[in-house]
């Protein structure tokens, strides 16, 4: 039962983590372009 709960947590966190990293990289890219880097 613990394995099912753990796999559910992992499956829920992975897309959120990937999305967060993508958004952070995108914002950093946008900010870098504004300063002409």
From Swiss-Prot:
Where does the sequence pass through the membrane? 5-25
How is it placed in the membrane, per its record? Single-pass membrane protein
Q: What is its main location?
A: plastid
Give a Gene Ontology cellular component term annotated to this protein.
chloroplast thylakoid membrane
* Keyword Secreted in record: no
Protein function: Component of the cytochrome b6-f complex, which mediates electron transfer between photosystem II (PSII) and photosystem I (PSI), cyclic electron flow around PSI, and state transitions. PetG is required for either the stability or assembly of the cytochrome b6-f complex.
Q: Which compartment or compartments is the protein found in?
A: Plastid, Chloroplast thylakoid membrane
Which key words tag this protein in UniProt? Chloroplast, Electron transport, Membrane, Photosynthesis, Plastid, Thylakoid, Transmembrane, Transmembrane helix, Transport
Organism, scientific name: Emiliania huxleyi
Q: Which family does it belong to?
A: Belongs to the PetG family.
The GO terms this record gives for MF are: electron transporter, transferring electrons within cytochrome b6/f complex of photosystem II activity
Report the record's Gene Ontology biological process terms.
cytochrome complex assembly; photosynthesis
Provide the gene name from the record: petG
- What interactions and quaternary structure are annotated? The 4 large subunits of the cytochrome b6-f complex are cytochrome b6, subunit IV (17 kDa polypeptide, PetD), cytochrome f and the Rieske protein, while the 4 small subunits are PetG, PetL, PetM and PetN. The complex functions as a dimer.
Per its record, how is this protein called by name? Answer: Cytochrome b6-f complex subunit 5
């Amino acid at each position: 039962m613990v394995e099912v709960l753990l796999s559910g947590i992992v499956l829920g966190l992975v897309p959120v983590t990937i999305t967060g990293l993508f958004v952070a990289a995108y914002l950093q890219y946008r900010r870098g372009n504004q300063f002409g880097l």
